[in-house]
Protein backbone atom coordinates (compact mmCIF):
# COMPACT_ATOMS: atom_id res chain seq x y z
CA UNK A 1 0.00 0.00 0.00
CA UNK A 2 0.81 3.58 0.61
CA UNK A 3 2.43 3.15 4.03
CA UNK A 4 5.71 4.93 3.14
CA UNK A 5 4.46 7.25 0.39
CA UNK A 6 5.90 10.77 0.43
CA UNK A 7 6.37 13.65 -1.98
CA UNK A 8 10.20 13.68 -1.86
CA UNK A 9 12.08 13.16 -5.09
CA UNK A 10 14.82 10.54 -5.25
CA UNK A 11 17.63 13.01 -4.43
CA UNK A 12 16.38 13.69 -0.89
CA UNK A 13 18.47 12.13 1.88
CA UNK A 14 16.62 11.21 5.04
CA UNK A 15 18.68 12.34 8.03
CA UNK A 16 20.85 14.77 6.00
CA UNK A 17 20.09 17.84 8.12
CA UNK A 18 21.09 15.95 11.28
CA UNK A 19 24.58 15.09 9.98
CA UNK A 20 27.58 16.69 11.69
CA UNK A 21 29.98 18.73 9.56
CA UNK A 22 32.49 15.91 9.84
CA UNK A 23 32.95 12.70 11.74
CA UNK A 24 34.64 9.37 12.13
CA UNK A 25 31.77 7.23 10.82
CA UNK A 26 28.68 7.49 8.66
CA UNK A 27 26.18 4.72 7.97
CA UNK A 28 24.15 4.79 4.77
CA UNK A 29 21.10 2.63 5.25
CA UNK A 30 17.83 1.93 3.50
CA UNK A 31 15.09 3.71 5.41
CA UNK A 32 14.15 6.52 7.74
CA UNK A 33 13.26 4.02 10.48
CA UNK A 34 16.81 2.63 10.34
CA UNK A 35 18.31 6.15 10.31
CA UNK A 36 16.32 6.96 13.44
CA UNK A 37 17.19 3.68 15.18
CA UNK A 38 20.90 4.02 14.40
CA UNK A 39 21.07 7.67 15.47
CA UNK A 40 19.12 7.08 18.67
CA UNK A 41 20.72 3.84 19.83
CA UNK A 42 24.29 4.09 18.54
CA UNK A 43 24.70 7.86 18.18
CA UNK A 44 26.26 7.12 14.79
CA UNK A 45 25.30 9.56 12.03
CA UNK A 46 23.12 7.81 9.47
CA UNK A 47 21.33 8.77 6.26
CA UNK A 48 19.12 7.02 3.72
CA UNK A 49 18.06 7.74 0.17
CA UNK A 50 14.47 7.17 -0.90
CA UNK A 51 15.24 3.60 -2.03
CA UNK A 52 18.08 1.12 -2.37
CA UNK A 53 17.86 1.60 -6.14
CA UNK A 54 18.76 5.31 -5.94
CA UNK A 55 22.37 6.40 -6.30
CA UNK A 56 23.64 9.80 -5.08
CA UNK A 57 25.15 12.39 -7.37
CA UNK A 58 28.95 12.17 -7.62
CA UNK A 59 29.34 15.61 -5.96
CA UNK A 60 27.48 14.27 -2.91
CA UNK A 61 29.64 11.13 -2.87
CA UNK A 62 32.77 13.31 -2.85
CA UNK A 63 31.35 15.56 -0.13
CA UNK A 64 30.55 12.61 2.12
CA UNK A 65 33.99 11.08 1.52
CA UNK A 66 35.58 14.38 2.57
CA UNK A 67 33.41 14.69 5.69
CA UNK A 68 33.63 11.14 7.11
CA UNK A 69 36.67 8.95 7.71
CA UNK A 70 34.66 5.72 7.33
CA UNK A 71 31.41 5.16 5.46
CA UNK A 72 29.44 1.96 5.92
CA UNK A 73 26.65 0.71 3.68
CA UNK A 74 24.07 -1.17 5.76
CA UNK A 75 21.24 -2.21 3.47
CA UNK A 76 18.71 -4.94 4.16
CA UNK A 77 19.86 -8.53 4.39
CA UNK A 78 17.10 -10.19 2.40
CA UNK A 79 18.26 -13.58 3.72
CA UNK A 80 14.80 -15.11 3.31
CA UNK A 81 14.54 -14.31 -0.42
CA UNK A 82 15.93 -16.28 -3.35
CA UNK A 83 17.72 -13.14 -4.55
CA UNK A 84 19.24 -10.98 -1.81
CA UNK A 85 18.44 -7.58 -3.33
CA UNK A 86 19.74 -5.64 -0.32
CA UNK A 87 23.15 -7.29 -0.65
CA UNK A 88 23.28 -6.61 -4.39
CA UNK A 89 22.25 -2.95 -3.98
CA UNK A 90 24.75 -2.50 -1.13
CA UNK A 91 27.57 -3.81 -3.32
CA UNK A 92 26.53 -1.41 -6.09
CA UNK A 93 26.56 1.50 -3.61
CA UNK A 94 30.09 0.59 -2.47
CA UNK A 95 31.17 0.65 -6.12
CA UNK A 96 29.40 4.01 -6.57
CA UNK A 97 31.59 5.31 -3.71
CA UNK A 98 34.68 4.08 -5.60
CA UNK A 99 35.16 1.42 -2.91
CA UNK A 100 35.70 4.10 -0.23
CA UNK A 101 32.64 2.76 1.57
CA UNK A 102 32.47 -0.66 3.21
CA UNK A 103 29.42 -2.91 2.99
CA UNK A 104 28.27 -4.43 6.27
CA UNK A 105 25.32 -6.73 6.81
CA UNK A 106 23.31 -8.06 9.72
CA UNK A 107 24.13 -11.78 9.93
CA UNK A 108 21.38 -14.22 9.01
CA UNK A 109 21.58 -15.82 12.48
CA UNK A 110 19.73 -12.78 13.88
CA UNK A 111 16.77 -13.30 11.50
CA UNK A 112 16.61 -9.50 11.11
CA UNK A 113 16.73 -7.86 7.71
CA UNK A 114 17.59 -4.38 8.98
CA UNK A 115 18.81 -2.53 12.07
CA UNK A 116 15.36 -1.60 13.36
CA UNK A 117 14.30 -5.27 13.13
CA UNK A 118 17.49 -6.23 14.98
CA UNK A 119 16.64 -3.82 17.81
CA UNK A 120 13.13 -5.26 18.01
CA UNK A 121 14.41 -8.85 17.98
CA UNK A 122 17.38 -8.70 20.37
CA UNK A 123 17.09 -5.36 22.16
CA UNK A 124 18.97 -2.06 21.83
CA UNK A 125 22.08 -2.92 23.84
CA UNK A 126 22.66 -6.21 22.02
CA UNK A 127 21.90 -4.56 18.66
CA UNK A 128 24.53 -1.89 19.30
CA UNK A 129 27.10 -4.56 20.21
CA UNK A 130 26.20 -6.53 17.07
CA UNK A 131 26.67 -3.39 14.96
CA UNK A 132 30.15 -2.81 16.39
CA UNK A 133 31.02 -6.40 15.44
CA UNK A 134 29.67 -5.81 11.90
CA UNK A 135 32.15 -3.06 11.20
CA UNK A 136 34.60 -5.81 10.37
CA UNK A 137 33.51 -6.40 6.74
CA UNK A 138 31.84 -9.71 5.94
Give, region by region, the residue ranges found by the protein language model.
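Alpha-helical scaffold elements adjacent to nucleotide-binding pockets in ATP/GTP-utilizing enzyme cores
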Residues: 88-96, 114, 118
